[in-house]
Amino acid sequence: MSRIGKRIIEIPSSVQASVEGSKLLFKNSKEKHELETHNRVKITLENNQLSFQPVGEDAQSRAYWGTYGALANNIVTGLSTGFSKTLEVNGVGYKVALGNKTLDLSLGFSHPVKYPIPAGIEMVVEKNTITIKGSDKQKVGQVAAEIRSFRPPEPYKGKGVKYSDEVIIRKAGKTAKK
């Protein structure tokens, strides 16, 4: 059984947290996030420490307990340090450029791919490396997955968009007939 819910979340001085009923509000100097929790989870905020308790002893309450503990921890981590994902673009003629609120990708199609950068996401492009930064872990991961989906890496030459820590399992090409 997982014990994620038992963790006490330390809230750093750069992040302010408050509880309003079943709603958790987090903010720092730039952004604010709110988390609507289920009524099967009791929230306690004391001395910059956030903890959750399941209201019932059933499996559903314990599931919510761990889920909301992890979500709150991700928000606190995002507001204090942030999250980032790095993508690499590999291939002949594949290029990446940052436009005005768009990411311009040349990925071998007959047209350039223009990806609008969502609010709360910051992108840095160096050569053929895209770094996606933000305070919302889900949004950073979603944006990275959407950009990767335009041209996923192929197993023969490794061309495409891949995560920097992703390992592409290569296949051998066809062999010549004898």
From Swiss-Prot:
<comment type="function">
    <text>This protein binds to the 23S rRNA, and is important in its secondary structure. It is located near the subunit interface in the base of the L7/L12 stalk, and near the tRNA binding site of the peptidyltransferase center.</text>
</comment>
<keyword id="KW-0689">Ribosomal protein</keyword>
<keyword id="KW-0687">Ribonucleoprotein</keyword>
<dbReference type="GO" id="GO:0003735">
    <property type="term" value="F:structural constituent of ribosome"/>
</dbReference>
<comment type="similarity">
    <text>Belongs to the universal ribosomal protein uL6 family.</text>
</comment>
<dbReference type="InterPro" id="IPR000702">
    <property type="entry name" value="Ribosomal_uL6-like"/>
</dbReference>
<dbReference type="InterPro" id="IPR002358">
    <property type="entry name" value="Ribosomal_uL6_CS"/>
</dbReference>
<dbReference type="InterPro" id="IPR020040">
    <property type="entry name" value="Ribosomal_uL6_a/b-dom"/>
</dbReference>
<dbReference type="GO" id="GO:0022625">
    <property type="term" value="C:cytosolic large ribosomal subunit"/>
</dbReference>
<comment type="subunit">
    <text>Part of the 50S ribosomal subunit.</text>
</comment>
<dbReference type="Pfam" id="PF00347">
    <property type="entry name" value="Ribosomal_L6"/>
</dbReference>
<keyword id="KW-0699">rRNA-binding</keyword>
<keyword id="KW-0694">RNA-binding</keyword>
<dbReference type="InterPro" id="IPR019906">
    <property type="entry name" value="Ribosomal_uL6_bac-type"/>
</dbReference>
<dbReference type="GO" id="GO:0002181">
    <property type="term" value="P:cytoplasmic translation"/>
</dbReference>
<dbReference type="GO" id="GO:0019843">
    <property type="term" value="F:rRNA binding"/>
</dbReference>
<protein>
    <recommendedName>
        <fullName>Large ribosomal subunit protein uL6</fullName>
    </recommendedName>
</protein>
<dbReference type="InterPro" id="IPR036789">
    <property type="entry name" value="Ribosomal_uL6-like_a/b-dom_sf"/>
</dbReference>
